[in-house]
UniProtKB/Swiss-Prot annotation:
Species of provenance: Salinispora arenicola (strain CNS-205)
Keyword set, alphabetical order: Cell cycle, Cell division, Cytoplasm, Septation
Record GO biological process: division septum assembly; FtsZ-dependent cytokinesis
Polar residues composition bias: residue spans: 97-111
GO cellular component, one term: cytoplasm
Acidic residues composition bias: residue spans: 45-56
Function recorded in the entry: Cell division protein that is part of the divisome complex and is recruited early to the Z-ring. Probably stimulates Z-ring formation, perhaps through the cross-linking of FtsZ protofilaments. Its function overlaps with FtsA.
Name under which the protein is recorded: Cell division protein SepF
Amino acid sequence: MGALRKAGVWLGLVEEDDERAYDDAGYDKGGYRESRYRSSRYSEDFGDEDDEDEEAAVPRSRRGDRSRLERAAARSGDVDHNVEGEQPERVERASVRSITRSAEPSESLTYHTRDNLALAPQPVRERVPADEEQRYQITTLHPTTYREARTIGEHFRDGVPVIINLTEMDEADARRLVDFAAGLAFGLRGTIERVTNRVFLLSPANVQVTAEDKAKIAEGGFFSLS
């Protein structure tokens, strides 16, 4: 064996078996086969145990990974099954729930507007007994100017029926006074009635003038009744 060949063997660049086979090739052709057989037998007898462990470890790790994946898949399947089983129960519970509210209306939430007040039922005024209706006095006024409208308003405000005789007024002032009397009766919830062409009767809300008295007024009996 040459020095360079030995150095290569020492450095691991050249295998020693190849060197031996090369040296024996010239003497015996069967030596190469024997050395080959010996090397294979040597590898079988004195093979590296680490190589076998590495080769066997690969399938084990793969089997371990496969088993872990199978367990994870089984767990996820159980979770999905549990979720699917819970969903119908949740839906059923949600469908059974009901909201109960108090049917009693709250008076604090009632807001009055102009439309509501117009449509709201008005309180019915109590009927005055017949004997009380007779307890009134009719005041007769003969205004000559529009300035006497204040006197008419004061009597009517005190609950006294007023007969307005406009025969002594001119046409323009008479119309103005009639308009005033109509507004006064409407504002105080009373009534205004035409007795003759220029005679009007103002009745307060709590006084009901009888038909007999109205007939006397129409005949010209402008007097006070007690």
